[in-house]
Swiss-Prot record:
GO cellular component: membrane
Name of the protein in its database record: Leptin receptor overlapping transcript-like 1
Keywords from the UniProt entry: Membrane, Transmembrane, Transmembrane helix
Subcellular localization: Membrane
Family note: Belongs to the OB-RGRP/VPS55 family.
Length: 131
């Protein structure tokens, strides 16, 4: 039952984060859809860590370096997702209010992604690795 509650709360967090992103795009005072490019970063962010978890053993000495590289790449993707709206706002493609809404959505979405890996990342029967 705890897994179901975690799944519901993670889906609620994802919906709230996407709501902030869409508010930053679709409100009539902003009306620019450039911030939707951060969706690519949402999709790309878990990929390096998922690949590293699949390819290496925990007993291998190389596994630590591979996981650290995956975490480094994931960090670069997350920092890019936070930097892109700021670059758009500095280039006057979007308003600063839209930038704030997108950054709030980024925080919620990446916290949701982190929560997913913390809840479902163990090697038990209720693991995301079986999906």
């Amino acid at each position: 039952m705890a897994g179901i509650k975690a799944l519901i709360s993670l889906s609620f967090g994802g919906a709230i984060g996407l709501m902030f992103l869409m508010l930053g795009c679709a409100l009539p005072i902003y009306n620019q859809y450039w911030p939707l490019f951060v969706l690519f970063f949402y999709i790309l962010s878990p990929i390096p860590y998922c690949i590293a978890r699949r390819l290496v053993d925990d007993t291998d000495a190389m596994s630590n370096a591979c996981k650290e590289l995956a975490i480094f790449l994931t960090t670069g993707i997350v920092v890019s997702a936070f930097g892109l709206p700021v670059v758009f706002a500095r280039a006057h493609l979007i308003e600063w209010g839209a930038c704030a809404l997108v950054l709030t959505g980024n925080t919620v979405i990446f916290a949701t992604i982190l929560g997913f890996f913390l809840v479902f990342g163990s090697n038990d029967d209720f693991s995301w690795q079986q999906w």
